[in-house]
Design a protein with these regions (language model features):
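Long, contiguous secondary-structure blocks with strong helical propensity
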Residues: 16-17, 81, 85, 117
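Short acidic-hydrophobic, aromatic-tinged amphipathic segments that line or gate anion-handling sites
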Residues: 104-108
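Short, charged, intrinsically disordered terminal tails
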Residues: 111-122
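STAS-typified acidic loop motif
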Residues: 2-36, 53-55
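Residues that form or immediately flank small-molecule/cofactor binding pockets and catalytic motifs
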Residues: 15, 88, 110
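Amphipathic alpha-helical interaction surfaces in cytosolic regulatory modules
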Residues: 26-102
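Residues at or immediately preceding the N-termini of alpha-helices
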Residues: 31, 109-110
Length: 122
């Protein structure tokens, strides 16, 4: 079994928002790393988590599935997910899988942090 090639850094943007910087690959093997980052961010009291995909090298269908799992967990806990830094290729995948309807996608960190703090569609 391969080890996850995913690295994360967690940064508090303000009292309610945390940025999770994601570097490397996002696959099914990334689940422990990303869920751990999610748990740490929520322990810090964040209600809005912004995923920074600027350092993303590769994502496969297992990674998309893992993001859906993360989204379900966030929704159950009344937390919001947003993302920025997606390449055109991965932005298109988010659109094809309709993840962009549940995770707000922004062009950069500044716009992601300034984005709405209330979910758009339910």
């Amino acid at each position: 079994m391969e080890e996850s090639a995913t690295r994360t850094d967690i940064r508090q943007a303000d009292g309610r928002t945390t940025v999770i910087d994601i570097r490397g690959d996002v696959t099914a093997a990334s689940e422990p790393v990303l869920m751990s980052a999610y748990e740490e961010a929520t322990r810090q009291g964040s209600h809005r988590l912004v995923l920074n995909f600027s350092g993303l090298e590769y994502m496969n269908s297992g990674g998309i599935g893992m993001l859906v799992t993360l989204l379900v967990r966030a929704n159950r806990q009344h937390r919001q997910l947003a993302a920025f830094g997606l390449s055109d290729h991965y932005r298109e995948i988010f659109e094809l899988t309709r993840l962009d309807e549940a995770i707000a996608i922004y062009d950069n960190e500044q716009s992601a942090l300034a984005g709405p703090t209330q979910g758009g569609s339910s």
